[in-house]
Structures are given as structure tokens and as C-alpha cells.
Amino acid sequence: MKILLANPRGFCAGVDRAISIVERALELYQPPIYVRHEVVHNRFVVEGLKQRGAIFVEELHEVPDDNIVIFSAHGVSQAVRQEAKERALTVFDATCPLVTKVHMEVARASRKHMEVVLIGHAGHPEVEGTMGQYASLQGGMYLVEKPEDVLGLKAIVKDPSNLHYVSQTTLSVDETADVIDELRRVFPEIQGPRKDDICYATQNRQDAVRELAKDVDVVVVVGSKNSSNSTRLKELAEKLGTPAYLTDCPQDIEPQWFDGKVKVGVTAGASAPEELVNQILTRIKELGAQSVEEVLGREENMFFEVPKELQIKQID
């Protein structure tokens, strides 16, 4: 049995930045450091940060006064920002800059009193944060998940000629394309972002899985079940006809996943660390894999700076 390892895989620039923000805050300010929501959706990463003194909460009322709070990579609503300001909490914002771009699109549309449609999954923290950027009382903001949801908007959209759409950054490109096509069919005048909202890392990892799935008998996606982009990778492989499994724990891997399989594809969601990928590879080798081959893929050079207050100066 042979393992083919997808490229690119694992951490993206936004996740790297978010984790660095928590690590540097712990180093510079000492524990406890509070983090609103899991900084990234990966159990392995979150447990490691907890052990170093990070305390993860779901809402700001769980953060004691006079403390530091970090907003997760998924972003927060304006109401959460205002609450932090009113309580004079020290805030470090780990929102991915690509999510912030979508937030700015929504805020801009809101100022123009345009109605906005967000393509995304209800309950996902990125969606909650993005919906929370809209403030216009004259317009409205609506969430759709699939093409079938679009027709229902006809009864509630006030002005189809003044309508804009944005997308959750971690959806599959295919998923959003179908919804966008339906939006344009039902609302021919709808406007969209100048550049697709799906982030570069999501796109690149999905492209890599498309190629990988053609050449293997089964795909293992390293990532947590609450990670949207990791789940999309699994679904994409399955859509292409290749059995796929999502795991963030080597002990969860079942020997029968590989019964009769010759080639095993392995990739990782944008919030999965390479350390965890290596643990998964070790487990698959224990189950009979004899070699690992890296598959060539698109090179990524994206880098996002941490806030200047957390930039640790080198001492000569």
C-alpha cells in the first residue's frame, strides 16, 4: 500500500496568523489569555493552546473584567466588538484578513442601504460574524445555503435592483457556483464581489483533492469534524467517486478503511497542523502502507502579519 500526500495541505496563512497571535499573547502577557470561540477549528491545536494557558469561551460575558480577549480567525459581529469596547477589554483580533474583506463588503453594502445575500452555513461562526456586519434598517441581509433556498428570497427581497451577494470563505467552489448561478437567474441585477470570496487556501486544497482523488482508492482528510473547509474536502472526494474519511485522531483510523486498497490519498484542512498529519501517516504505515510520495501542487507564499503590539522584537 502506498500513500500519496496532497500539496498544498494543512495550515493556511490566516490560521498561522491566528495561532501566532494566541502564542505571542501568552508569551508577552502571560496566562490566562481568553479566546472567544476556538481560534481555529482543530481539536489538536485548541488542546495544545489550552495546556499553555489559553481559556476558550463562547461569549464575552465569560471573560472577567480587565483581561485580554482574542477574537478567533472566523471573525465576530460588530455587536461583539462594541461589547468588548464598552467593557474596556484588551482585544487582539485574529480574524483572517480574507474574512475581514468579506466583512468590509457587507459593511459597504449596508452603508449604501443595499440588501445582501450571504451564501453560507447557518450556525457557523464565520457566518454569524459576517451577518453581524450589516446595520442598515432600510435594507436587509439574508442567508442561503443551497440553490433551492434562492426562490424563497423573491418574497422578502425589497428591491431586486439593489442587491449584493457575498460568500462564506470556506465553502467549496462548486457549492457556491451553483448558488450564484441561481441567484443570477432569479435576480438578474444582483451584484457580487469583484473577486471571488472563496479564499485561496480553500481553492488550492480543493484543487489538490480533485487531482488526488483521480489517482487513489481512498482519501483520508486530516481535520476536525467542526472544520468547514476540512469537511468540504471529504465531500469533494466523495463527489468524485472516491471513498473518504475525516479524522483528527490517529486512534480513530479503522483498518477496514484500507481493505483491498492499493493507493491512499492523504490531505489536510487549512486548520490541521503538519504534526498531526505526520501522526496520521504513522498510523497508516502501521496498517500496512510501505511508502509515502509527495504530490506536486501549487506553491503558497501568502503571509499575514500579526498585530504590531504582538510583534516580538529580536534583541541583538
UniProtKB/Swiss-Prot annotation:
GO terms for molecular function: 4 iron, 4 sulfur cluster binding; 4-hydroxy-3-methylbut-2-enyl diphosphate reductase activity; metal ion binding. (2E)-4-hydroxy-3-methylbut-2-enyl diphosphate binds at H41, H74, H124, T169, S227, S228, N229, S271. Its EC number is 1.17.7.4. Isopentenyl diphosphate binds at H41, H74, H124, S227, S228, N229, S271. Its cofactor is [4Fe-4S] cluster. Keywords: 4Fe-4S, Iron, Iron-sulfur, Isoprene biosynthesis, Metal-binding, Oxidoreductase. [4Fe-4S] cluster binds at C12, C96, C199. The keyword Protein biosynthesis does not apply. Pathway: Isoprenoid biosynthesis; dimethylallyl diphosphate biosynthesis; dimethylallyl diphosphate from (2E)-4-hydroxy-3-methylbutenyl diphosphate: step 1/1; Isoprenoid biosynthesis; isopentenyl diphosphate biosynthesis via DXP pathway; isopentenyl diphosphate from 1-deoxy-D-xylulose 5-phosphate: step 6/6. Binds 1 [4Fe-4S] cluster per subunit. It catalyses: isopentenyl diphosphate + 2 oxidized [2Fe-2S]-[ferredoxin] + H2O = (2E)-4-hydroxy-3-methylbut-2-enyl diphosphate + 2 reduced [2Fe-2S]-[ferredoxin] + 2 H(+); dimethylallyl diphosphate + 2 oxidized [2Fe-2S]-[ferredoxin] + H2O = (2E)-4-hydroxy-3-methylbut-2-enyl diphosphate + 2 reduced [2Fe-2S]-[ferredoxin] + 2 H(+). The active site is at E126. Coiled coil: none annotated. Catalyzes the conversion of 1-hydroxy-2-methyl-2-(E)-butenyl 4-diphosphate (HMBPP) into a mixture of isopentenyl diphosphate (IPP) and dimethylallyl diphosphate (DMAPP). Acts in the terminal step of the DOXP/MEP pathway for isoprenoid precursor biosynthesis. Belongs to the IspH family. This is 4-hydroxy-3-methylbut-2-enyl diphosphate reductase. It comes from Vibrio vulnificus (strain YJ016). The lineage of its organism: Bacteria, Pseudomonadati, Pseudomonadota, Gammaproteobacteria, Vibrionales.
